[in-house]
Amino acid sequence: MDRDEELTLENLKLCRSIIDPIIDKYDGRIFYTAGDSVIADFESPVSSVNAAIEFQKTILKRNNTIKNDFKLVWRVGIHLDDVIIEGNNIFGTGVNIAARLEAACSPGQILISGAVKEQVINKINTNIADAGTKVLKNISSSYQTFGISPSGEDIVKTNAKEYANNKKIKSYKPKLAV
């Protein structure tokens, strides 16, 4: 295996050792993982947003300690919708929309739909900024989206800016759709 691939795999495992317990802490259930992507379901939008904020902050702290290795910068899409659960699988338009929101994110960003914003706006301590209307691949409607920054700390811009401006960083953009 190429050294970069080995290092990436080690870093991915380390990030998952951070992310998975946080998802569990907020009563989330991981349904699917493939390489650098995770699909999880939560009992409430508040839980999903709090989990995303906590792990983005934790991953950012981790990345700030890495000098010449790979940094993994995650993107998170969160949507609220009905889903179908069969055994260990999760299906439905809601899953697709969350995945498309994640794909529309900048590295380090948490992007939520308007439905999620309405549920969390007065229930969590965070900054929520209008991120514009997005046309999502293979989704018939466009969606109003919002970016989240934890407690006044602009994690969205910090991670994305670091990723864009630091040419020395070899970074991959793992994904989490909830």
Language model features by range: what are they?
Residues 1-51, 58:
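Catalytic NTP-binding/metal-coordinating core of nucleotidyl cyclase/transferase enzymes
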Residues 32, 68-70, 169-172:
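Short, flexible hinge/linker loops that cap or flank conserved catalytic cores
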Residues 14, 76, 152-155:
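Bimodal feature
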Residues 39-142, 149:
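Catalytic beta-strand-to-alpha-helix segment of the class III nucleotidyl cyclase homology domain
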Residues 25-28, 65-66, 165-167:
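Short beta-strand/turn micro-motifs at beta-sheet edges
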Residues 164-178:
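Acidic, proline/glycine-rich low-complexity intrinsically disordered segments
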Residues 138-165:
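N-terminal intrinsically disordered, acidic low-complexity segments at the extreme N-terminus
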